[in-house]
Amino acid sequence: MVKWDGEFSPVYSTISSTPEYKPTLLGEIPSLGKDEAIKALDSACNAFDKGKGLWPTMKVVDRINAMENFVEEMKQKRDVVVKLLMWEIGKNHTDSQKEFDRTVDYIYDTIEAYKKIDRDSAKFQKHSGINAHIRRGPLGVVLCLGPYNYPLNETFCLLIPALIMGNTVIFKPAKHGVLLISPLMEAFKKHFPPGVVNILFGRGRVLATPIMESGKVNVLALIGHSTSANSLQESHPKKNRLRLVLGLEAKNPAIILPDADLDLSLIHI
């Protein structure tokens, strides 16, 4: 971790704890800028080292051990992460607990899926008279941007698979739900080699744009709005080489009953 001596931005709760409904200060985060974003990018690139770095060349069993050790330490931070999740984005306590537990389960499921991929890759596959030995490898530097409504679960759905496959990651938490990452930073530092996990705090447009403009990002992993995805793609100078993992606006169906107020229903939908 790098010590920050610059400006900080306050983080307020969506829930007021005063009779006057004044904002409740929960903490503060560093206001990082373009220079810090490029340093994080260089750190990720150096750690990957064109696929020759310590993490991408590490044995599968060792990467799995690192991830298992990380999640075990993460589980010890359950109470504080749940409270920060609840206070910052206004999610109730039960749902906050469910999000944490679901995230832990997802990490274990990802580990098991990776074990299966590794076992299957040891076998030869035959198709049309051709025998092939196929192995999956890391892609490079991944920029991960998660949503505010599930700032832990959906963000880790991008982050964890990228890491366990041997990629290096630049990760910017969502604008809301940012403090819950703080209790986990020591675990990231402890269980992953330097430069593998790079966490940036600040405004997405300020940080993500110069990173994408560098052309050094191999994968954009984003859950959010299509406008953001399109803008980031356009800023990458090598679009044909950029891989995308996107979860954008949903098209969920809605059922409106005959006795409903149509105008009111449309507002809430």
Regions found by a protein language model. Give the residues of each.
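Active-site/binding-pocket entry motifs
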Residues: 17, 113, 261-262
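Conserved small/polar residues in nucleotide/adenosyl-binding loops
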Residues: 267-269
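Rossmann-like NAD(P) dinucleotide-binding subdomain of oxidoreductase/dehydrogenase enzymes
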Residues: 119-264
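Terminal low-complexity tails and localization/encapsulation signals of metabolic enzymes
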Residues: 1-29, 62-69, 101, 116-145, ...
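A broad structural signal for alpha-helix termini and local helix breaks/kinks
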Residues: 2-3, 89, 192
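Glycine-rich loop-to-alpha-helix module at the N-terminal edge of alpha/beta enzyme cores
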Residues: 20-117
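Short, charged helix-to-loop "capping" segments that act as catalytic/coupling loops
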Residues: 13-24, 45-60, 193, 213-215, ...
